[in-house]
């Protein structure tokens, strides 16, 4: 009886180079949710700040190098073989995983604000590398000119920014407070410009007038191009805008004062108090944006009142938290009642001007 010959083990067939890149992009994107919610790695070892930042920067350099290599080999023909591509993909995946592993070494007790900044940088690097994989997975004849280099550059920029990340929670808090000051400053300037011009949609209307000058008809009037009065402020609207602008100015003053106190009196080891200050300050800019958007016509006075009240609540909470923290020594807190009085004055005026809306 003839012995049966065992079948030879099947050799797995590698996917094409471009398919491997697409698969790697998917794998990298699956890492993003984990990074967003991932906790710091628990360890009994004392945190070594210098070693952490050195390892993080080295990991970023490795990711940047892999991005460079991949961009070069996949931006020209002939493409690498499936076996070569597999090796490239494994190196990229390993570099990204190594970077994420270093991020997880940053403990919470170093500050939530600092950890958020490092997490954001980590997400930028992972997402940038995934974008690069997706762009390079398009064949060179289909790829838009320089598109691969643009995506590669975004990864490179994210890696290059690692040394600029604040090294402690106080520096991280100052960075976030500065961003919030700038956001509120921009919103205030836009509001002031619109009020000075008395024409909030001037740019839009000018474009519309040019586009419709040759075919203006009755239908345009009905649709409001450009004569719809809903695009302009009434006298009552303009009167209400005045205390709203003052309230936004108070918001800017509040943030600038908080930033100054953190810069002058903030202590690096008081991470929890600094985090609390940043958390409440982060709510000011979105509240200012809501109020700014609500003043554009057609203006709903009740919405303006509600958004103003929300902003006032956030401002008072920010002042309360700042006053109770170590950044505000008691002799230096006299400015807080003055600012609260200014905020209350603005809100009371807004209430007066919108009272009729509540009586309808």
From Swiss-Prot:
Entry protein name: Cyclin-D1-binding protein 1
Chain positions found as N-acetylalanine: 2
Compartments, record wording: Cytoplasm; Nucleus
Ranges for region Interaction with TCF3: 2-184, 150-360
Quaternary organization: Interacts with CCND1 and GRAP2. May also interact with COPS5, RPLP0, SIRT6, SYF2 and TCF3.
Keywords, sorted A to Z: Acetylation, Cell cycle, Cytoplasm, Nucleus, Phosphoprotein
Pfam families: GCIP_C, GCIP_N
One Gene Ontology cellular component annotation held by this UniProt entry: nucleus
Signal peptide bounds: none
Post-translational modification: Phosphorylated.
Induction (record text): Expression is induced by sodium butyrate, an inhibitor of colon cancer cell proliferation.
Metal-binding recorded as keyword: no
Stretches for region Interaction with RPLP0: 2-190, 240-360
Family classification: Belongs to the CCNDBP1 family.
Main localisation: cytoplasm
